[in-house]
Amino acid sequence: VDRIHIRTIRRFALKKKLVLATAIVTGSAWLLAATPSTHQVAGDPAIPKRVPAVFPAGWRFPAGSRATFAPHAIVASNNRLAAQVGAQMMRQGGNAVDAAVATGFALAVTFPEAGNLGGGGYMVIRMADGRTDALDYRETAPLAATRDMYVGANGKLNGESTIGPKASGVPGAVAGMIEAHRKYGVLPISRVLAPAIGLASEGFIVDSTLNRSLASEKYRIGGFAGKSVFFPNGAPPAIGSRFVQPQLARTLRLIASSGSRDFYRGSIADSIVAEMRRNGGLITKEDLARYQPVWRQPLRSSYRGYSLISMPPSSSGGTTITEMMNILEAYGPTSPFGSAERIHALASASQRAFIDRNSKLGDPAFVRIPLSTLTSKGYARAVAKTISRDHADATTRLASQLREGNETTHYSVVDGAGNAVATTTTLNDLYGSGVFVSGAGFFLNDEMDDFTARPGTPNMYGLIQGAANSIAPGKRMLSAMSPTIVLDPRGNLLLVTGARGGPRIISATSQIILNVIDHRMSLFDAMSAPRIHHQSLPDSIGVETGGIERSVLERLTQMGHYVYDLRGIASAASIMRVKGGYEGMDDPRSHGGAVGF
């Protein structure tokens, strides 16, 4: 895109939130190498025929390629080794939840920048019999946390919410994965953790992605105990070398034998607290012993006859996507993909949904959330009427009107019985707070930055949030994680998706769904298509470089939109039902792969 027309502003850190997607379908016990799909959907009335996409001439991902196809089980992930672990669980007779849990623990070994034991996340489940569930294992603020703990004497933020021991919330990942397995898994937990233990104790081959990631974050890791593990000679493990993690292997063995007990009340908890004391952190044995994941009622919504199953608060993802898509539905018929009219509608709906997200959402145990209003069709119709057809509206004016009226990884699982799981987990930043639990082998998160440290001041993603998300002891911080399951108008599973990238998770996830439903794109095209992002403040539209035609840009500028350039808008991993099985893929913006059988 011509830089005369695109004004580049400081981009917010895309790398902070990472996503992994895993789709698993149980079937016959023989394994096939996953191959590019040539399957067509013509002739199957339950699966609408896809329409070839047309992207701008300068766009870096050409339309028309195929995602990976597998008839029985498929795992699509930012990390191929973790994807192989998920497929392995299914071959051993496990269900979708077994595969999701095994993949999650494997990611803690092979994808340490985001996969984790020291973070938290969300899981959305739909069983084949129609039951749905949502597990919230988001981190919580330590009991010693205070509302203004990151505000210095000069009234400015002191930076302690993003790096170092005071940035860490009480981790929920281990409790969450063990609880999900307890309720829905069918294999012994020791078998589910066995692949991750093997990867940690025997090691795996370092690829360029891990090598570069560690090198870029040496400043974050180097001040704590992880330096000796990840930079033993002053440099990260070389590409092609075998990386062994004996401390982490020991921790995983303890979890395999005791579940979450040792992590929250035993020797692993002792190691976490000792690390906190050495570095001046806040997490105590009482914090860990009190932590509990929470089962919640999934958020159910509809869009043009399709059903969405998503995560309710403390995640903001499901609520914001629901409101945004309800507004678009009320706004009227869909304009062509990539047109100024379509981008204007998308940006305007997103702007309004983010205004509500940033001011009204938080931990439901601490704040009263008008959830039924925000997700209602009636409210969306009223909000849609505030969108002009030919000009942009200022966020400051809209905020008054509406008041009156990470690093992350995502994985998605589908098994042959029709059970589906969408999971997103995070450390927030790459390698979290940088604090490494010596003797236990894992990083702790820096999720405290997802709270409103000071109303009116942006966090690392540029989000300006309100008092509903302020810090309080034991409170869950707001998140943009958006694990989502989509059903077709007949109630059949269609899509399992989620993304990485801070608040841009919401944009990527919603636009993949819209591409599939409104524009009838194939999975590859829906994932590859150019994306846009509007989070209310800054009051502007981010567009991916090369993803917009000059004439469209000029029209948006005439309408009063401030448009700026982004290298990328999140990174998703998704699975879609097609004739004869499933397609799955990691985002072309990422470096993972798909494994299936």
Regions found by a protein language model. Give the residues of each.
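Bacterial N-terminal signal peptides that target proteins for export
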Residues: 6-22
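Bacterial N-terminal signal peptides
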Residues: 21-30
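Noncatalytic scaffold domains of N-terminal-nucleophile
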Residues: 35-84, 88, 96-97, 101-258, ...
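Internal maturation/activation junctions in enzymes
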Residues: 52-53, 330-427, 439-440, 447, ...
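Active-site rim segments in enzyme catalytic domains, especially the processed small/beta chain
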Residues: 109-134, 282-284, 420-489, 523
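Short, small/polar residue-rich loop motifs at catalytic or cofactor-binding pockets
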Residues: 295, 405-408, 430, 479-481
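Extended C-terminal subregions enriched in glycine
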Residues: 475, 509-510, 518-567
